[in-house]
Amino acid sequence: MLVKTYSAAVIGLEATTITIEVNITRGGTFHLSGLADTAVKESYDRISAALPNVGFKTPTANLTINLSPADLKKEGSGFDLPMAIGILGADGKIDSGRLEKYMLIGELGLDGKLKPVRAVLPIAIKARKEKFNGLIVPVDNIREAAVVNNLDVYGMENLADVIAFLNGTGKYEPMVVDTRKEFYEQQYTHELDFSDVKGQEGVKRVLEVAAAGSHNVCLIGPPGSGKSMMAKRLPSILPPLSLAESLETTQIHSVAGKLGKNVSLISQRPFRSPHHTLSQVAMTGGTTKAMPGEVSLAHNGILFLDELPEFSKQTLEVLRQPLEDRKIIISRANYSVEYPCSFMFVASMNPCPCGYYGDPTHHCVCTPGQIQRYLSKISGPLMDRIDLHVEVPVVPFKDLSKMAPGEPSSTIRERVIRARKIQEERFKPFKGVYANAQMTERMLHQFAEPDAASLDMLRMAMERLKLSARAYSRILKVARTIADLEGTEKVQSQHIAEAIGYRNLDRSDWAERGV
């Protein structure tokens, strides 16, 4: 008897419907076809152990299973459930008429329990698109799948529950999630707040500008100056995620298997802070399964690299394309995958290996050669892609003990949101552009054209600091953001002057140190 069940395979962020054809005839052999990987090939062993543990015998007849389309690689243990149901259907133990109405996904334990799998959200989106009556998933995946509206999602504890449901002998209700309500209920106040930061008003201003225009920023200063402390508080002044951004971000984390148990939506902007031992592949994504890397996991949020020169030069150089294109393409032998990676790049670094170059309170023990080797790990093209780089001085103890709490994040965030709304209105005609940092050269001419005085100032800065054309564009983008924070329609000379002041690493004294 031939029976068909349905599941899905996920490549990148896209799911493809997989038809599992199960045929039982006389004999005693097992055949599996359809370009299955090792985990799928091992499914029959798990199914054979699970069936007796839920009260069913494993068929001893000749069993052939085909996963179609045959030219698409099938990976992972999520095909356990649809294969097991197909075997029981072909053996006459399940009403085969109901099988075509549901998509199934889930790993089987030897005791018959359903274990969670990754990438359930893209599969749920595909099930709705293909107009299946419902999706059956492990109970631990139910909230992730149920955020897809207009699709009945059933979370099951074990194989016996699925069999009872398909035979109509058990009453199971689909999980209903009000996606919009769920999203807003999960938003919370950040625990880290800029009011904790004493002093550093100039650096806070830089971070406010960065947040307002989604600009990349690098903080340079000695140990203990508060670089990491302020970077970790940057999410608290960013605009909240929109529902569309939340769904897109959740989908990436779902594919990567990074969603926690019973998590339905990511409602906060991601803040990724990988260790400096991070590999090139872990940064961009890859492995044999073309999984998302740190640049994609930071999509719609922040990628923070603490102690930037400690990362390998190869790892840092692969950031150049994602920072420019805001997407990453991972190519394999017979397919390629594209992931979005539109993030704010935030870096911190010491000025030298010992950390105290230029610090008036500590003596630097590094030789000029050591400083040059340390800073040369950061290439000019990478630094060009960072809009703002600013020095972070140490706050003296006498000032720390006297200073009142700083301005709270909520106040700064209000100004940032006002500036972002101006940008959203400005860029409405341009698809995929929502912040000044994303402006093209043509948009710069339209929205950030400097006046004659500003142009002279820029020309002098370009000549003295030997700036690249890319740095010129970055200065204009930052100046446009400063003008938006002030509510000014035109970019003026004071905005240009402030933006030039945020190019610390372009100054000659830094250039002499090897940057």
Language-model segment annotations:
Residues 18-24, 283, 387-390:
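Short beta-strand elements
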Residues 219-260, 325:
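Walker A/P-loop
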Residues 300, 306-307, 318:
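Walker B catalytic acidic pair
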Residues 33-44, 59, 66-76, 290, ...:
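Basic, amphipathic alpha-helical bundle interface domains used for macromolecular binding and assembly
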Residues 1-218, 225-228, 331, 471-472, ...:
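Peripheral, non-AAA+ core regions of ATP-driven protein-machinery
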Residues 221, 285, 307:
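The Walker A (P-loop) glycine that initiates the GxxxxGKT/S ATP-binding motif of P-loop NTPases
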Residues 170-209, 213, 240-295:
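P-loop NTPase nucleotide-binding/switch module
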